[in-house]
Amino acid sequence: MRSEQQFLDEYGVSHQNPVNLVVHMLCVPAIFIATFALLWFVPVGRFVPGLPAAAAPYVNAATLGLPLVLGFYGLLSLRALLVGALWLAVSFALILGGIAAALPVLWIAAAVWVLAWGVQFYGHQVEGAKPSFADDLVFLLIGPLFVQQKFNRLLGKRQPQAQ
């Protein structure tokens, strides 16, 4: 398996244009959160025999995907695992907060997901390069690490090299 730095370097090749970088800084977080929100509404818990009814809403495609996503990040590095855990925690806090506020989270997530992907494809058109995930779907999980690295640089934080 490629190292975290190899993934980031490869991802960075098709993310050089300043417009595309801004697009990614805005849209990657939106897509990440919206994707997990959409997956939240794929119920699984109600089909699990013996699962307490109170737990059923929390057993869904998003929570079942959680160990897979964190496992991948953990294979890359501790830093990737911590960044991934932070992004997932923010995602789940927004999802649960939206549900608690009786917002139409599913519809908001669907609209954000479609709009953000449209803007992403525009960014790649400006870049003149196809999205990295067109060659390897794992790059859908590298985008958040790339964006976090860019955010850290904007904030003036030294970015350690991935191991």
Predicted regions, residues:
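Membrane-proximal soluble regions of multi-pass membrane proteins
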Residues: M1-E10, Q125-Q163
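Membrane interfacial helix-start motif at the N-side
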Residues: L8-P29, T35, V69-A80, V126-G128, ...
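Juxtamembrane "helix exit" motif at the C-terminal ends of alpha-helical transmembrane segments
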Residues: F32-L51, L88-A100
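Juxtamembrane/interfacial segments flanking transmembrane helices
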Residues: P43-V48, L78-L82, F121-L137
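Structural signature of hydrophobic alpha-helical transmembrane segments
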Residues: P49-T63, L106-A111
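Hydrophobic, membrane-inserted alpha-helices
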Residues: L64-F72, L86-I95
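Transmembrane alpha-helical segments that form the membrane-embedded catalytic/substrate-channel core
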Residues: L66-R79, V112-A129, P144-F151
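Hydrophobic alpha-helical membrane segments of integral membrane proteins
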Residues: L82-W87, P104-A111
